[in-house]
Amino acid sequence: FVVLGMQAQQHVMTVDVSKPTARINPAMYGIFFEDINFGADGGLYAELVKNRSFEFPQPLVGWIPFGEVTVQDERPCFDRNPHYVRITNDGCLLRAGLDNEGYRGIGLKKGEDYRFSAYVRTPDTKPMKLSVELVNSNGENLLKKELEVKGSEWQKLTAVLKAPFTDVRSRLRVVLQTEGTVDMDHISLFPVNTWKKRENGLRADLVQALYDLNPGVFRFPGGCIIEGNSLATRYQWKNSVGPVENRPLNENRWNYTFKHKAFPDYFQSYGLGFYEYFLLSEDLGAEPLPVLSCGLSCQYESNEVVPLGELG
């Protein structure tokens, strides 16, 4: 046998970047966002409270009530999100209220400010006293702020809380201190330091990461999530705009893709809706590419189709 060794030939390519030969369309490179694995609620959308409007099919998912806490829907604050909680302190129990666990925990950073808000009312003639607390993973409430509730009409309460600790599994706690009753809805906690400091804003660190990619096009809000598991749960963009408190909850296409992988707490609050997506496109300097429902549900889950004559 004869083995012939051949030395690999070397080639040199010289590129003169000062003389571009063809223009590359900036829209050839971009990013595609879809709410998978808590990508929106619990991710890019900076809201820290899960199920803030008590509209999940099991209305207290994400909440740990203590004392007398019930879910009501009479004379609601928001017609498309009618459920709220009624907290009653009868004077016999040590306390009455509820904790929110967030999205696998509420991540807080020491020294950072967080904006609490809620819609409240009381049937009692005297003012009610609420305490809003930040509780660490050891169960210690290291920050407590008291707020006053008075009047039988819905009103919005707000407060800024400065976190005294860093903990990725914190909780938000609301306690009715006064003997009496208080109704609460749309209980919310946002970092003040969102992207561009906007209320109802996005996580600054995640948007910065997207911005640094310098995308030419931004596609949203997804692919399969648009179809929904059925036509009833398809993404309808008109429900994702308007006052954030009254945007109706929708099921997430990815909450039970497989029978052995069900996520009963995976829904879409629409707090991150079409208005916010278009605004984000402007911030990124990217062309917006919205995806709309064509009247076809996910064909893996159902075979529902809107008749062609009914599309509009």
For each predicted feature, which ranges?
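Bacterial Sec-dependent N-terminal signal peptides
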Residues: 1-10
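Extracellular and organelle-lumenal recognition/adhesion modules and their flexible linkers in secreted
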Residues: 9-269, 282-291, 302-311
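Residue-level signal for the nucleotide or nucleotide-sugar donor/cofactor binding architecture
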Residues: 272
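Alpha-helical bundle segments that constitute or directly flank the non-heme di-iron/ferroxidase center
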Residues: 278
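Conserved radical SAM core fold
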Residues: 295-298
